[in-house]
Regions:
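Sec-dependent bacterial lipoprotein signal peptides
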Residues: 1-21
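Subset-of-secretome marker
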Residues: 23-234
Length: 234
């Protein structure tokens, strides 16, 4: 993702615990025979650094994350295209209310829908205030320790290796701006067998001070380098 919004995003991800169907090729210690997890993670980081466009779904379970304008992120879905283009739909909480807002970021400006009227308005919005899949995924692949490939599973129709590892909470700006260091968290990454795209990342545990220990965040990526049009909203 070397040209995709470098410095544009800053991220957090969330989600429910996942039941995984299908596994194969593991030994008695729960690792996939013949797979070097560290080498696989480096291959994934290198490949993702080259991705120019992708679709993402970001979710969080057992809590929300502060993003911007008083909003608490519940989930987000959208597309990144090129160095400075993004569009997403955000489900969030504003006080006690559940709301949905749209965000569009373009080279010449950014826009957000008014939560009350639904109308688009110009705004100084940087995805770096809450979401960085572009830089964060690559950095995370290189920050984890004690990695092992535990299973071979299907994710969205793709054959992947599930890699489990440990990561310091301070390395998780991918999921939350201001991530506090000092906690060892369980990280999972689903990496393609045929080509090392990262299809899913999941983090268990508190990333920010005061979060619940059972917080789960998940980022799902797809449609790598597929054409997507992002234009000024009307």
């Amino acid at each position: 993702m070397k040209n995709v919004a470098r410095g544009l995003f800053g991220l957090l991800l969330g989600v429910s615990a996942l039941l995984i169907a299908g596994c194969g090729g593991g030994d008695e210690e729960g690792t996939v025979e013949g797979v070097d997890a560290d080498a696989l993670l480096e291959s994934a980081a290198t490949r993702m650094d080259e991705v120019e466009a992708f679709h993402f779904i970001l979710t969080q379970e057992n809590g929300t994350t502060d993003i911007l304008m008083g909003l608490e992120l519940v989930s987000a879905e959208g597309d990144i295209a090129g160095a400075d283009r993004a569009q997403l739909e955000v489900r969030a909480k504003l006080g006690s209310s559940n709301i949905e807002v749209g965000i569009v970021i373009l080279p010449d400006g950014s826009y957000i829908t008014n939560p009350l009227t639904g109308r688009w308005q110009e705004a100084e919005v940087s995805i770096s205030s809450f979401f960085n899949p572009e830089i964060g995924v690559t950095a995370l692949m290189r920050a984890v320790t004690d990695a092992k490939a535990t299973r071979r599973v299907q994710v969205g129709g793709a054959d992947t290796y599930l890699v489990e590892a440990v990561v310091d909470s301070g390395n998780l700006d991918l999921f939350a701006a201001g991530a506090a260091p000092g906690r060892e968290l369980l990280a999972r990454a689903w990496i393609g067998v045929d080509e090392p795209f990262v299809y899913r990342v999941e983090i268990e545990g508190a990333v920010i001070e005061g979060e619940a220990a059972n917080t789960v965040r998940r980022l799902e990526l797809s449609r790598f380098d597929e054409p997507v049009e992002i234009s000024t909203p009307r």
